[in-house]
Structures are given as structure tokens and as C-alpha cells.
């Protein structure tokens, strides 16, 4: 997972910055952000007869001519010509491992698979997709999918049917858990039937839902730990997307930006920090971050909010208690600008963060709480800036801002299996 996320997030930043900085105008982009709650049945025998497991799943959505982010999936287009029915992409996708939540942390959460996809569009509604995917141990599976998109007024529906081939190593790892049981099973083919739905409520607000059922192959079903042949899942939630009732703007008010910050770790939680009661890290661990802001839109529900997709690269400096590490972030950030009496702006970002080596501030907290730490965590950013040009009455500086931001990694209070089902994380006060 480490190398794939590293390459993917770094390439995302390069592609976005290259495209946007070359344009004199910034048109409104296809974007979205959502909060989903997933519940799935557990097909395995469990000690406490747990039949379902649930997780909170924040999602981002974005697409331009170079790449896309679609909820739990993202990719880079290798071939995508407007006059062709074919499309080829390098993709990554989160795959849920549905076991009781009490043991998900020991299993180190869900998995991110990487691979390639070829898509063929039969017409404006129906398409076929072929994928070859692998996990971080290069255990392979392939997907053969037929799917469609239909719109009926405020409703959008996406039915799909997928046949999945799993090699013996993949099947043994995720359906007989060979490392724990010693049981090896053969390759198999399972089938999944599902449907996604999106309903436009008003303006930028949408309701989201998804359900599917999977029929396990005979090799998986006859594993000594599998109890049920059929497994179901349901997603429900809401999100903010482009208002389908409005024509997209051809020239946005907000422009791309680059943000550089330096920060200091604190063992304090977010509540104490906002109360101005933060403790200093005794080892003075520090970080330096670089973020690029790609404009998505300049309003939400008719309010003047500047919305950005913001990939970032963070260097955590070595100290007496940690070696250096690199963090990769991708998030969606909203800014609200106001006058008091000079021009200020307040920002909030939500996204995900991957770090190649766990920092001291996170490792010590996880050790105290008895968790296995997770490299992949949820990301939050809160910032307040003052406009330098306004502050010094210099028109040439009106695009420059200076201020404070809180750099936060966490796992959503044990409610997210994809983040290792842990509670806690790290905070850095940055300027």
C-alpha cells in the first residue's frame, strides 16, 4: 500500500497543479464530498455470534481530464479520448474486510488494492469494465463488470453485476485467513449484484445509498471459518455535489494557490487546542508542509464559499525520538472570507492522510491505548488567515495570506475500519 499511495498522491498533485496553473480561467469542476455509513454481514463463524459490522466512510469525488476520485476508488487516466468508446486507467480501490470490529485493529484494517482498468462504453448508459487488481502482497484478483447509469429527474441510478476471479493466495488470505488458521484454499469465482442511488434534495445537497449481495465461490464457502455463502452490504449517507439544476460557471472567482507551513507537534487533543490550552511536545517534533489548492467552485448553497481540492506533501523532521517521514494528503477544503476590519478567511478541510513511518506523537499514544497504529488516517485541517495586502494596504500583496492552521490526523473514534478501528492520532500547530 505504501508505494502505491505515495505514487498516486504525488502524481495527483503534479497533474492538478500543472493543469490549473496553465489556465488563465478556472471553470467550475465536477466535485463532491460525502459522509456514508456502511453495514455489511459477516460471512464467517464468530466467537460472539457477530452477524454484522459497520463503519463510517468519508468520501471525496472529483474528475478532470487527467484523473478521478470516486468515493472509495481513484485513478489516473492512461487513455481517455472524447471520440473513443474505450478508456484505460491505473486505479486504486478500498476493499472492506468484513470481520468483527473487535479484531479489525489486530488485522490492521481494510485493504487498498491497486491495478488497471479497461472500460468500453456500449452507449450513453451501459458499459463493460475489466480490471486486474492486487493487494500490497501482490495477491491478485480480477473483475469483469457490466454496469449502467440512468437519470430520472432528481434520481440517479447505477446498477451493476460483477464476476470476480480470485487466485488461491488471495482466497486463502481473505476467506480462510491462512496465516492464523493454516488452511489454504484454491482459486475461486464469486459474483456480486448491486445498485447505487443518488437523490438530489435541493441545491448542493444529495442523499446517497448503495446495496449489493455477493455469492461466494465454493472454495471460499467450504473454508472451515466461513458460515454463510451470501454476503450483503448497505451504504446510506448524504453529500454535497454540483447543483444539477444550475449551469456550471466558466470562470470562478477563486484561483489556484500554494500554501507553505511549518508546525510543532502537541500531545493535546483538538478540544484543548481550541481552548488555547495546548501542551508543548517535550521532544519538539516538527513538520513542514506544502499544499496546492485546485479551485472546484466558489459557492455552496448560494453562499460565497471557495471550495478547493488540495493535495499536500508533508515532511516530518527527524528528532531524538523519531526518524524523518513523509506524509501524503488529499482533501477538499472550504474557505469563507469576511472583513473584520481587514480581510480574513476561515478554512476547513476533510480528506485522508497516509504516512510512510508512524511519528513519535502517534506511536506513543497508540502504545498507551493498546492499538496497532494505522498509516492511513482521516485528515482534518482548520485554518484562519489574514490578507497581507489588506493588512499593509499594499494592493500588490492582495493574493498573499498569513495565518494559523491545525494539522490533524485521526481515525474517527474507532468508527472507521479503513483507518484501523482506533481512537486518537496527532495534532500539529502550524503557521
Q: What annotation goes with each model-predicted range?
A:
Residues 29-35, 58, 67-69, 86-90, ...:
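Transmembrane beta-strands of outer-membrane beta-barrel proteins
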Residues 37-43, 64-66, 92-98, 132-138, ...:
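Transmembrane beta-strands of outer-membrane beta-barrel pores
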Residues 29, 52-58, 108-114, 138-142, ...:
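Residues that define the transmembrane beta-barrel architecture of outer-membrane proteins
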Residues 23-68, 165-169, 233-295:
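Short glycine/proline- and aromatic-enriched beta-strand/turn motifs that initiate or cap beta-hairpins
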Residues 51, 99-105, 158-198, 225, ...:
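Outer-membrane beta-barrel translocator/channel fold
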Residues 35-37, 58-64, 78, 116-120, ...:
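Residues on the lipid-exposed face of transmembrane beta-strands in outer-membrane beta-barrel proteins
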Residues 200-256, 379-431:
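Predominantly the C-terminal beta-signal and adjacent terminal strand-loop region
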Amino acid at each position: 500500500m505504501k508505494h502505491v499511495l505515495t505514487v498516486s498522491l504525488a502524481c495527483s498533485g503534479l497533474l492538478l497543479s500543472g493543469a490549473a496553473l496553465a489556465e488563465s480561467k478556472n471553470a467550475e469542476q465536477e466535485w463532491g464530498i460525502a459522509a456514508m455509513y456502511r453495514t455489511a454481514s459477516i460471512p464467517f463463524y464468530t466467537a460472539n455470534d457477530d452477524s454484522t459490522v459497520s463503519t463510517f466512510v468519508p468520501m471525496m469525488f472529483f474528475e478532470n481530464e487527467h484523473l478521478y476520485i470516486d468515493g472509495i476508488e481513484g485513478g489516473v487516466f492512461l487513455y481517455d479520448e472524447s471520440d473513443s468508446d474505450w478508456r484505460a486507467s491505473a486505479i486504486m480501490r478500498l476493499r472492506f474486510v468484513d470481520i468483527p470490529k473487535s479484531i479489525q485493529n489486530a488485522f490492521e484494517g481494510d485493504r487498498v488494492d491497486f491495478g488497471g482498468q479497461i472500460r468500453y462504453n456500449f452507449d450513453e448508459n451501459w458499459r463493460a469494465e475489466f480490471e486486474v487488481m492486487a493487494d500490497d502482497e501482490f495477491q491478485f484478483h480480477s473483475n469483469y463488470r457490466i454496469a449502467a447509469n440512468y437519470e430520472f429527474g432528481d434520481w440517479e441510478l447505477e446498477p451493476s453485476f460483477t464476476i470476480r476471479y480470485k487466485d488461491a493466495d488471495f482466497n486463502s488470505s481473505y476467506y480462510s485467513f491462512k496465516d492464523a488458521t493454516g488452511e489454504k484454499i484454491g482459486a475461486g469465482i464469486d459474483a456480486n449484484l448491486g445498485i447505487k442511488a443518488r437523490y438530489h434534495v435541493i441545491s448542493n445537497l444529495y442523499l446517497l445509498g448503495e446495496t449489493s449481495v455477493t455469492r461466494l465461490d465454493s472454495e471460499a464457502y467450504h473454508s472451515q471459518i466461513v458460515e454463510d455463502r451470501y454476503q450483503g452490504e448497505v451504504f446510506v449517507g448524504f453529500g454535497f455535489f454540483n447543483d444539477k439544476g444550475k449551469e456550471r460557471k466558466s470562470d470562478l472567482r477563486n484561483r489556484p494557490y500554494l500554501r507553505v507551513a511549518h508546525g510543532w507537534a502537541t500531545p493535546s487533543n483538538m478540544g484543548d487546542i481550541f481552548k488555547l490550552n495546548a501542551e508543548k511536545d517535550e521532544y519538539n517534533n516538527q513538520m513542514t508542509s506544502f499544499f496546492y489548492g485546485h479551485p472546484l467552485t466558489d459557492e455552496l448553497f448560494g453562499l460565497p464559499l471557495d471550495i478547493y481540492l488540495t493535495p499536500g506533501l508533508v515532511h516530518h523532521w527527524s528528532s531524538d525520538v523519531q526518524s524523518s517521514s513523509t506524509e501524503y494528503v488529499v482533501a477538499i477544503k472550504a474557505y469563507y472570507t469576511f472583513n473584520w476590519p481587514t480581510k480574513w478567511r476561515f478554512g476547513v478541510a476533510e480528506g485522508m492522510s497516509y504516512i510512510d513511518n508512524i511519528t513519535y506523537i502517534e506511536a506513543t499514544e497508540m502504545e498507551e491505548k493498546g492499538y496497532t497504529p494505522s498509516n492511513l488516517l482521516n485528515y482534518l485541517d482548520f485554518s484562519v488567515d489574514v490578507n497581507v495586502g489588506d493588512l499593509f494596504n499594499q494592493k500588490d500583496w492582495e493574493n498573499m495570506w498569513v495565518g494559523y492552521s491545525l494539522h490533524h490526523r485521526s481515525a474517527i473514534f474507532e468508527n472507521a475500519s479503513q483507518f484501523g478501528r482506533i481512537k486518537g492520532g496527532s495534532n500539529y500547530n502550524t503557521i
